[in-house]
Amino acid sequence: MSVATLQRKLPEAAPRRAGQTELHPELNRAQVRFIGLGKTYQGQQGPVQALHDIDLSIQRGEVFGIIGRSGAGKSSLIRTINRLEQPSSGRVLIDQVDIGDFDEDRLVALRRRIGMIFQHFNLMSAKTVWHNVELPLKVAGVPKAERERKVRELLELVGLKDKHRAYPAQLSGGQKQRVGIARALVHDPEILLCDEATSALDPETTQSILGLLKEINQRLGLTIILITHEMAVIRDICDRVVVLEHGRIVEQGPVWEVFGNPQHEVSKTLLAPLQHGLPEELQNRLQSHPTSSDAALVLSLRFTGSSHEEPDLAALFGALGGRVRLLQGGVERIQGHALGQLLLAVQGSSLEAAQLRQRAGQWAQQVEVLGYVV
C-alpha cells in the first residue's frame, strides 16, 4: 500500500449561479467561509452570546489555528462547520455552498466530508484498534472487502499496522490519538477538525502527532482546522491563526506575523509563555540611570519576522561599540521568517543611549532601552 492510494482529486468549487456576484480571488479559494456568524445559547441567567459577527475565510489545503482564552468561542466556531452547532445568525459556506438549509441527508453527506478528532480519544474499550477504525465504514454500509482495504491503509498511514489486534487499554495516549486520526479519515474527508487534539499528550508524543498531521496535510491535501491552548502547536504546524476573545475576532494573520508582532493585548498574553521575559535577578538590578562609570546599558531587541535573514550579530555588536554581552534570548525561524528577542548589555561604549538604540534598530525591528546594571 502507498499513501498515494488515499489521495484523491479535490473537488472544484461549486459552479457559480447565474447572476451571482463575482468573488474576490481570495474568497474564490476559500474552502470554509463564515459570514456575519453569531451563536447565542440560553443560559440559566438568560441568553449568552458565544459568537459575534464572525467574518473569516479558511483556504483549501491550509493548516489554520484558532486560539483564545477559555470561553472565547473556539469550539462553538468549529462545530458550526459540520453543523454540530446551529448558528443563531449569519452563514457558513463550504466550497461556496451555504450549509444552513441542508436537510438530514445532505448533513450526513457533509459530515462524511469533515473528519474530527478530540482531546479525549472516544475509543470503544471493548473493540480492537481495527474495529474502532472500521465501525464508521460498517455503519455507512461499505462492503467488507472495501472496509478491510481502507482500514489496512489507514493503520499503515498512522503507523499502527502492527497494533490492529490491540485494545485501547493496551495503547499509549499517542497511539490512541493515532487511532482517532485513522477513524476520522475513513470517509476520505476534505477537512479535518482538531479540538485540543494534543492537550492530553506529553511533549514528545505531541510532536509525533503534529508530524503525522503535517504529513496528512501535505500528502492528502487535507484542510486542517485546529483549536489548541498550546501556542507552540500553532507555531509548529499552522499557516495562519485567528485570535478570539469573547466570541469576537481580535486578530488574525500568518503565524509568523501574529507571533512576531502581536497587536492585541489578548494575543500578547497568550503568546507570553513563548517570549523571553526579563530574568527576575536582572530586573531587581535595573536602574533608570547609570550609577557608576562601569554601568552597562541593557537593550531589548525584538525581531518580528519582517526579515527572512537572521541578524548578523558580529556586525551588530561591532556597531554598538564597547563591550557587548548577550544576557538572554535567541532567534528562531517560523515560516521562513526570523523571529526572536535578544537582551544585550553594552558597557564602555562612546555612544549615548539614544544613539545605541538607533544603531541597534538597523538590525532589529523593535528596540527598547530597559535601564542600566552594574
Curated annotation (Swiss-Prot):
Stretches assigned to the ABC transporter domain: 32-271
UniProt-annotated binding residues for ATP: 68-75
GO molecular function: ABC-type D-methionine transporter activity; ATP binding; ATP hydrolysis activity
Membrane topology recorded in Swiss-Prot or TrEMBL: Peripheral membrane protein
Region (Disordered): 1-22
UniProt key word Disulfide bond: no
InterPro entries: AAA+_ATPase, ABC_transporter-like_ATP-bd, ABC_transporter-like_CS, ACT-like_dom_sf, MetN_ABC, MetN_ABC_transporter-like, NIL_domain, P-loop_NTPase
Matching CDD domains: ABC_MetN_methionine_transporter
Catalysed reactions, as listed in the record: L-methionine(out) + ATP + H2O = L-methionine(in) + ADP + phosphate + H(+); D-methionine(out) + ATP + H2O = D-methionine(in) + ADP + phosphate + H(+)
Keyword Transport belongs to the record: yes
Location(s), subcellular: Cell inner membrane
Enzyme Commission numbers on file: 7.4.2.11
Record's keyword terms, sorted: Amino-acid transport, ATP-binding, Cell inner membrane, Cell membrane, Membrane, Nucleotide-binding, Translocase, Transport
Secretion signal span: none
GO cellular component: plasma membrane
Family listed: Belongs to the ABC transporter superfamily. Methionine importer (TC 3.A.1.24) family.
Subunit-level organization: The complex is composed of two ATP-binding proteins (MetN), two transmembrane proteins (MetI) and a solute-binding protein (MetQ).
The protein's role, per its UniProt record: Part of the ABC transporter complex MetNIQ involved in methionine import. Responsible for energy coupling to the transport system.
Entry protein name: Methionine import ATP-binding protein MetN 2
Taxonomic lineage: Bacteria, Pseudomonadati, Pseudomonadota, Gammaproteobacteria, Pseudomonadales
Gene: metN2
